[in-house]
């Protein structure tokens, strides 16, 4: 699973940042992900996955805190 967030910073920069690659296995077999545990739990939580609006609202807050700028859109694929 990949999570990308469209962002706009206070300095006027904007773009899309890839913030997670989930279920990618290393050579040693360990899975990698680049999200804080709190956000990872929300991605994994069925309640958030079935209620997209609530999931996006909650994740945008956490992701913006991590990335440090305003999040306009979150895409998961």
Where does each model-flagged region fall?
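Acidic, low-complexity, intrinsically disordered interaction modules
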Residues: 25-67
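N-terminal acidic leader/helix
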Residues: 1-40
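Solvent-exposed beta-strand sheet faces enriched in polar/charged residues
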Residues: 75-77
